[in-house]
């Protein structure tokens, strides 16, 4: 599996994630530029990550240096933040993202969460008063306008349950191309994958390694005994086993490392397959969702429980 392996929609199967704790523009710019030189072509960002500008700078530098022939050789995903998840704010928000990226379009624009906040609410912690009802129809109609204007080649969602996708599909004139959600061997998303496959929606995995080291991540994936046993028996790293498993599900995956050796390793999971026995053992791993989205739940907000946020699909 290489960085150039693509879905039917033209999205590279492996993307480099850029969610970081606090703004670090120069290290991100350098890491993205090196990733392009190594062979990455898909970069995942979001307004909330504050990494759009350094990605744009790295992309421009890569074109100047000849690492890629043009911006068109790259696939850039960004996301609409909750405070702009209002019908009249979506197009302006994407235009702001494009200014940050110094680009005329993004390849994929996603609704980051099925959540709306008051305009201007960008940084956690959030209060109950920050949340307002999510007008899915108005937001999606504005997302469709982004596509019609040529600002986004494709549009999609993130962190949507089967139920929310079903609601969206009931009125969408342009269906979502992608649903980006947590997927890893500890949270395998069998029901959601089957639903998306039946609707022609590409599942894209974030946190395929469990987001160890983040404020909400867990060691549960990398420390799973089954995965460690398989890795040892195959002469692979646990990360390679996880990424190979996600790849074999047909999902795209977003993986983040700014360490060059790991960036290379994350691309180099081709030329081997998990055995049926290994797949069976992974399928039996006890399931638990890692990124629960607790910050979006409030007694006074639209989602009063995790069950409501995820429609019972956790």
Swiss-Prot record:
Q: Which PANTHER family match?
A: ALDO/KETO REDUCTASE
Residues the UniProt record annotates as site (Lowers pKa of active site Tyr): 79
The residues that the entry says bind substrate are: 112
Protein known as:
Deoxymugineic acid synthase 1
pH-dependence note: it reads: Optimum pH is 8-9.
One Pfam family name from the record?
Aldo_ket_red
Keyword Transcription belongs to the record: no
Q: Where is the active site?
A: 49
The pathway noted for it is: Siderophore biosynthesis
A single Gene Ontology MF term assigned here is: 3''-deamino-3''-oxonicotianamine reductase activity
The reaction(s) this protein catalyses? 2'-deoxymugineate + NAD(+) = 3''-deamino-3''-oxonicotianamine + NADH + H(+); 2'-deoxymugineate + NADP(+) = 3''-deamino-3''-oxonicotianamine + NADPH + H(+)
Q: What is its EC number?
A: 1.1.1.285
Q: Which family does it belong to?
A: Belongs to the aldo/keto reductase family.
Which enzyme type, at the first EC level?
Answer: oxidoreductase
What this chain does, per the entry, is described as: Catalyzes the reduction of a 3''-keto intermediate during the biosynthesis of 2'-deoxymugineic acid (DMA) from L-Met. Involved in the formation of phytosiderophores (MAs) belonging to the mugineic acid family and required to acquire iron.
């Amino acid at each position: 599996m290489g960085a150039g392996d693509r879905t039917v929609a033209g999205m590279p199967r492996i993307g480099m994630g850029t969610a970081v704790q606090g703004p670090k523009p120069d290290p991100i710019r350098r890491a993205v530029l090196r990733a392009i030189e190594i062979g990455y072509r898909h970069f995942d960002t979001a307004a909330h990550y504050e990494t759009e500008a350094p990605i744009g700078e790295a992309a421009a530098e890569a074109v100047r240096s000849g690492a890629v022939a043009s911006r068109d050789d790259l696939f850039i995903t960004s996301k609409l933040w909750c405070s702009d998840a209002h019908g009249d704010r979506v197009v302006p928000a994407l235009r702001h993202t494009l200014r940050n990226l110094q680009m005329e379009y993004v390849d994929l624009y996603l609704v980051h969460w099925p959540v709306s906040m008051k305009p201007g609410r960008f940084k956690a912690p959030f209060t109950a008063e920050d949340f307002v009802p999510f007008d899915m129809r108005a937001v999606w109609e504005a997302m469709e306008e982004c596509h019609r204007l040529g600002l986004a080649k494709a549009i999609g969602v993130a962190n949507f349950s089967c139920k929310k996708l079903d609601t969206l599909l009931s009125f969408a004139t342009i269906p979502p191309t992608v649903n980006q959600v947590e997927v890893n061997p500890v949270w395998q998303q069998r029901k959601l994958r089957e639903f998306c496959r039946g609707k022609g929606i590409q599942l894209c995995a974030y946190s395929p390694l469990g987001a160890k080291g983040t404020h909400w991540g867990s060691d549960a994936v990398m420390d799973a005994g089954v995965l460690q046993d398989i890795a040892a028996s195959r002469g692979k790293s646990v990360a390679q086993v996880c990424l190979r498993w996600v790849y074999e599900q047909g999902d795209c995956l977003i993986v983040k490392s700014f360490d060059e050796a790991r960036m290379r390793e994350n691309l180099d999971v081709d030329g081997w397959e998990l055995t049926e026995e290994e797949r069976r053992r992974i399928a039996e791993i006890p399931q638990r969702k890692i990124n629960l989205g607790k910050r979006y739940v409030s007694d006074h907000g639209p989602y009063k429980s995790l069950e409501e946020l995820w429609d019972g699909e956790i």
